[in-house]
A protein has these predicted regions:
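Short, electropositive, low-hydrophobicity segments enriched in small/polar residues
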Residues: 23, 122, 129, 205-207
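Glycine/serine-rich phosphate-binding loop and adjoining beta1-alpha1 elements at the start
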Residues: 95-192
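Solvent-exposed alpha-helical segments within well-ordered globular domains of core cellular machineries
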Residues: 45, 83, 110, 131-134, ...
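A general structural signal for well-ordered secondary-structure junctions
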Residues: 53, 91, 163, 219, ...
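A glycine-rich (often HGG/GG-containing) alpha/beta subdomain
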Residues: 2-3, 9-121
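Conserved short-loop catalytic and cofactor-binding motifs
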Residues: 31, 169, 220
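Glycine-rich phosphate/diphosphate-binding loop of Rossmann-like nucleotide-binding domains
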Residues: 182, 187-243
């Protein structure tokens, strides 16, 4: 198959996406599916071993963990992706934690375009998602998991996302869940300079929120609360090492 022609040889190839996202799944469950950036490459290698998966890419953020794939059989490919998710979960109850988001063919392309454009984000126009989609694309190429079809639709999505941000009002200022939360707090409470701020949870969004607070010097004491104390310790050590 020629890389310059994603449509060649696709008679028995089907585009699918399968996973979980914030529309259907609460945060506590999304955390069980989350694949750290450092593990994405290994996860792609695992996907290669499934018989029906011919191409794959993984987009894993705070709000979604989605496997984009080209499969030679829809039912078999979806079963392979579900088996993959069962193998990477951090708990054993696979009946409760099955992926509940699935799309086929053209709907996959439309979904990825919306994601990259920030139209499917928890905060409309979220700016970080473009970098996350780009990273998912690059890692899939580097691991030789993405072939011509996924390469094509990811490039299309990134181009669309860039165009939306340059030609509409969504690109006028940086937007994320963390920045929106801080903006809302300042709107309701006024200046945070003399106030203690409690950050509940030290996942990706919590860490970004803390970094915003520290870099801007925009609050008094910052208190971190998390179910896992070791995660707070690791985050604080990384902050100290980066100084």
């Amino acid at each position: 198959m020629s890389r310059s022609d994603p449509g060649s040889g696709t008679m028995n190839q089907h585009l699918v996406v399968c996973g979980i996202n914030y529309h259907f799944t609460p945060l506590a469950i999304r955390e069980q599916f989350c694949i750290p950036d450092s593990c994405i490459g290994h996860a792609l290698e695992a996907l290669k071993r499934f018989p029906h998966i011919k191409e794959s890419a993984i987009l894993s953020t705070c709000n979604r963990t989605e496997v984009y794939a080209v499969v030679d059989d829809v039912r078999g490919g979806m079963a392979d992706i579900e088996a993959f998710f069962a193998s990477v979960q951090h708990v054993s109850d696979h009946e409760i934690l099955k992926p509940n988001f699935k799309l086929l063919r053209d709907d996959v392309v439309l979904h990825l375009l919306r994601v990259a454009a920030g139209l499917d984000s928890m905060v409309l126009g979220e700016d970080r998602i473009m970098a996350q989609v780009k990273s998912a694309h690059q890692t899939a190429l580097e691991r030789q998991a993405a072939g011509p079809l996924l390469d094509f639709i990811f490039k299309l999505a990134l181009s669309c996302g860039k165009k939306v941000r340059t030609e509409t009002s969504m690109g006028r200022r940086a937007v994320s869940v963390s920045s929106a939360a801080l903006e809302l707090a300042r709107t309701r409470l006024g200046s945070l300079a003399e106030k203690s701020v409690v950050v509940l949870g030290i996942g990706k969004m919590g860490q970004i929120c803390v970094k915003h607070l520290l870099s801007e010097g925009g609050s008094g004491a910052v208190v971190l609360l998390n179910r896992n104390q070791e995660r707070i310790t690791a985050f604080l050590k990384s902050k100290l090492n980066n100084k």
